[in-house]
Amino acid sequence: MRRIVGDPWFYPVLFVAGGLTFMIAGTRLQQVGMIVAGLVLAGYAVTYRWAVRVRSRPFAGAQAHVEGGGVVVFWRPGCPFTRRLVTELTAQERERAYWVNIWQEPAAATFLAGLHEARDGHPHQAVPTAWLRRRDYVVATDATRARLKDTLRQRAGGDA
């Protein structure tokens, strides 16, 4: 189930299906409010897809990116913390980060668990996690999101 919910197409399809259901029911019941709600849901599917788009890259290049001064962000589709982070980043900031999907890359999931074990004393796969040359941290609060945004702005001239 988590693989279906985690696919990038899942929520847009769900919004469109819900929107169509509302529009059909609204048409049959002659309820303008339901038709409008259906249009809003269907429209949200389009904006959602654009707002949460990141380009996932292979884990094999992550180490070189970090050694070059870049930022690697481990993420998984469907994660509300990841979605909030992605929507708060600008398109340029999203492009500067090296995004690695831990559901598509089992080696990345294992590596992430090792990072957390070294820092926290127990392995886990909390995402989104930012990995830099000298540190790593879970990006789940306003303060850590601001910290990541500042880091990405500082690296604006560097390798993306």
Annotate the PLM regions.
Residues 84-87, 110, 143:
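Generic recognition of short, well-ordered alpha-helical segments
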Residues 57-98:
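Local sequence-structure signature of Cys/Sec-based thiol-disulfide redox active-site neighborhoods
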Residues 115-133:
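Structural micro-motif
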